[in-house]
Design a protein with these regions (language model features):
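Boundary/linker segments flanking structured domains
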Residues: 1-44, 48-126
Length: 126
C-alpha cells in the first residue's frame, strides 16, 4: 500500500503560492518535497503548525536558499486541522508513513507534542 499524506495537490514553494492557497492563522500540517521524473511527489520533510500554517511553511523557502542540495524543497502540500492535537497525530502518522524513523526524511527528530502552556505557545512552532 502506498503511503499517503492525505493532503491533496502540491504547489510550488513560493511566497505567492503560499499566500494564494493558505489562509492565515490556521492550524495544520504540511510536507516539503519535489516531483520525480514520473511526476510523483517525493516527501523530504513533514511538519505542522499549531498557530499559523502559512507563516510556518514560508520557513521552507529560507531553508532551501541556505542549502538547495540538502533541502530539496521545490513544492509543498498542506492540510488544515481543527486542533493542535489533531495536527500532532497527523504529523506523527506522516512521519512514520514516510520513513522518518528510518532516516528517509530531513526531520531530525520525532514530532514534538503540542505545548498547552499558553505562556510559551510559540515554542511549538520551532
Amino acid at each position: 500500500i502506498m503511503a499517503s499524506l492525505n493532503m491533496g495537490v502540491s504547489y510550488a514553494l513560493t511566497e505567492e503560492e503560499i499566500n494564494a492557497n493558505i489562509e492565515p492563522n490556521r492550524i495544520g500540517n504540511y510536507a516539503f518535497g519535489y516531483l520525480n521524473d514520473r511526476g510523483v511527489f517525493i516527501v523530504k520533510y513533514v511538519g505542522r503548525s499549531d498557530t499559523d500554517l502559512r507563516t510556518r511553511i514560508k520557513h521552507g523557502i529560507a531553508d532551501r536558499e541556505t542549502d538547495p542540495a540538502m533541502y530539496r524543497y521545490e513544492r509543498f502540500k498542506f492540510s488544515y486541522a481543527d486542533t493542535p492535537e489533531e495536527a500532532y497525530k497527523k504529523e506523527c502518522k506522516n512521519y512514520q508513513d514516510f520513513g522518518g524513523d528510518k532516516g528517509k526524511l530531513i526531520n531530525d527528530r520525532y514530532p514534538q507534542a503540542p505545548d498547552y502552556d499558553e505562556t510559551s505557545s510559540s515554542s511549538s512552532e520551532m
